């Protein structure tokens, strides 16, 4: 994957899960200097933090798209809480609407087909070739020739393909920032600080980072309006 064989491949309606676990990129993928690095192997998942079923795309720097953007904040929070970790583990289910049993049934129905041909009914050809590579099986191999272990590994890759996220894009390319003044320290009715009287916060000053889709700008407008109104009223009160 480090040779960018998946660059530009887009996936529709996949399920991306962020795990409470460190990703472990292969030696070759560690050499890639992107913010998000596809990995061959990852540590065993322990607890799922969040799952988003949307579109995603492999890019020149790693991976992106609606599902990844929604997961990115959780990845950054996990990495911040685990400074000793080099990356955070994500997995992708390429066919979330199908169970492994259903995938197996479809495969058995076409067991005489070449593995590449079979995989192309579920994923784009370039991704299918990567899956064959991960299995160590030639693309033209008939599905019926796979061993039980290879079939089991295939379904694991199809439903939990591991990716290691080492971080997000730099601030100038971000959609929203995280961090700031804790909302627990602000009166939500007035946006006034609970610690310093007469000090009001709004927008990016607050530790609010919602999903893309207008939520962040709405939060900025609403908190800005409230903070502005109550700051003005507070000023009038102080003037007597």
Predicted features and spans:
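Predominant activation on well-ordered alpha-helical scaffold segments within soluble catalytic domains
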Residues: 69, 152-155, 159, 222-232
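Short, basic, low-complexity termini and linkers enriched in Ser/Thr/Gly/Pro
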Residues: 27, 238-240
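Short, flexible micro-motifs
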Residues: 65-68, 76, 182-183, 206, ...
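Short hydrophobic core segments
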Residues: 56-61, 199-201, 224
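A glycine-rich dinucleotide-binding beta-alpha-beta segment and adjacent secondary-structure elements
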Residues: 129-209
């Amino acid at each position: 994957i480090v040779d960018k064989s998946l660059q530009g491949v887009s996936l529709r309606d996949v399920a991306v899960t962020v795990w409470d676990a460190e990703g472990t990129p292969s030696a070759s993928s560690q050499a890639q200097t992107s913010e998000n690095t596809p990995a061959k192997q990852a540590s065993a998942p322990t607890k799922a933090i969040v799952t988003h079923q949307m579109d995603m795309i492999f890019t020149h720097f790693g991976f992106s798209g609606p599902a990844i953007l929604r997961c990115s904040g959780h990845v950054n929070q996990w990495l911040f809480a685990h400074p000793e970790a080099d990356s955070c583990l994500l997995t992708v289910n390429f066919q979330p609407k199908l169970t492994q049993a259903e995938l197996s049934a479809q495969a058995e129905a076409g067991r005489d087909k070449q593995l590449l041909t079979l995989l192309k009914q579920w994923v784009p050809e370039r991704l299918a070739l990567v899956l064959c590579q991960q299995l160590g099986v030639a693309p033209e191999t008939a599905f019926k020739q796979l061993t039980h272990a290879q079939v089991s590994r295939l379904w694991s890759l199809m439903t939990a393909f591991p990716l290691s996220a080492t971080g997000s894009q730099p601030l100038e390319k971000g959609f929203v920032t995280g961090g700031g003044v804790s909302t627990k320290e602000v009166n939500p009715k007035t946006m006034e600080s609970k610690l310093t009287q007469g000090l009001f916060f709004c927008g990016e000053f607050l530790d609010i980072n919602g999903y893309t889709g207008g939520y962040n700008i709405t939060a900025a407008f609403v908190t800005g309006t409230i903070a502005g109104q109550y700051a003005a009223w507070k000023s009038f009160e102080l003037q007597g």
